[in-house]
Amino acid sequence: MKILAFTAGAAKMYCGSCLRDNALAAELKRQGHDVILLPLYTPTRTDESNVSEPVVLMNGISVCLDQQAAFFRKTHRLLDRLWDAPWMLKLASQTSLEVDPHLLGAMTVSMLRGEDGFQLKEIRKLREWLEHWLWHEPRHELPPDVVTLPNSLLIGLARPIRQALQRPVCCTLQGEEIFLRQLQEPYRRQALELIRAKIHDVDGFVAVSHYSAGYWIRELGIAENHMHVVPLGINLEGYAALERAPHQPFRVGYLARVAPEKGLHVLAESYIRLRRETEFSGAVLQAAGYLAQEHRAYLRGIERHMKDAGFGAEFHYHGELDHARKIEFLNSLDLLSVPCTYDEPKGIFLLEAMAAGVPVVQPRRGAFPEILAQSGGGVLVEPDNPASLADAIYRLWKAPEERAELGRRGAEGVRAHYSVSRMAGRALEAYEKIVASVAHA
């Protein structure tokens, strides 16, 4: 199968969606399929071999400038060449900036308007690139069987892409509802209205969990026969899942982006409860993951809370980890918890932990129940409830045999149900159904 897949760069962050898009493309290539992975906005950053093309479309610098000033919405070839230069994109990707909620909301709405938005010039450049790629590149003598978009925030590109290539377009749904919920009004309402209005520009949708599929069917009114579920899968290379001996000290871990919605503060509060109210001792709380500039004060608050409680020396933040260091970090843990305060539709951090044989403790919300039901590698607790989380951690601390059994089942469950090869097989089935539905329409 020939697949043209777009992926949205996230500047210098290891983005879960980018990792998923890259892993899927790499596995499909390994299986012999012709996959072209095209970055949008910025180059992608992955913790595995990056298989994306060395080009960036819908340049993030131009997209932002087009939003802010009419001057940039006209073609200025010298400036466009400057913004498109690899060194400029690299510089922009490595720069940390405070996020302006107003600009972010307005730009989201403008991008969803597609050719009616302020980014028309960039969309025309995208169409021109695709048409040249289709007709003038010897490598691409045949058009793709299907084109995939990485999320519904880019659904405004579906119509111009379909017009340029005359091929079916599939839209992946992989967590953008969290971003939409955080938009200020009226941008959140406007964005959802635009996505609903454009669902017919897409020939099919792929959700990364059954929870996510149900959410979007209800939210957007997508027909059930247009929705396909392709659960996440991870590359298991490097994950040994060896027999795990208890560590000393006992290590409670967190591996996710450090942000309020991911719930590190909930885990810290649970840890403090355990230390104050039970004989739980000889332990440390270890955290790792990307930290944005706007969330540094949040992390400092957690560090201060741990210190004020008398346990500052038992908390350590390891920063953002590459693939090898991530596996090393997971191998050092006795259990992992990322107690999200929202309905998480993905949970790739659970798959990574369980692949390493680490039992997990998660709130009963979002995709977590289906992942743990399928894998058997952890326990569920009440959402937004530090006491419930503390009770579960305490029970597992007291029961090394149960921890070992959960770790074994989780490692087996991930290998059986959440490998990258399983994800690729399910994705191909979904793409083939979408292509067939268009052919028979």
What are these model-predicted stretches?
Residues 359-362:
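Short hydrophobic beta-strand element within catalytic cores of glycosyltransferases
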Residues 388, 395, 402-416, 423-429, ...:
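A short, well-ordered alpha-helix in the C-terminal region of glycosyltransferases
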Residues 245-262, 268-271, 286:
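Conserved donor-binding/catalytic core segment of Leloir-type glycosyltransferases
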Residues 211, 233:
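Carbohydrate-associated surface elements
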Residues 37-125:
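A conserved catalytic-core segment of Leloir-type glycosyltransferases
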Residues 299-321:
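Nucleotide-activated donor-binding/catalytic signature segment of Leloir-type glycosyltransferases, i.e.
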Residues 284-303:
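Glycosyltransferase donor-sugar binding loop
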Residues 374, 379-386, 395-400:
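Conserved acidic donor-binding segment of nucleotide-sugar-dependent glycosyltransferases
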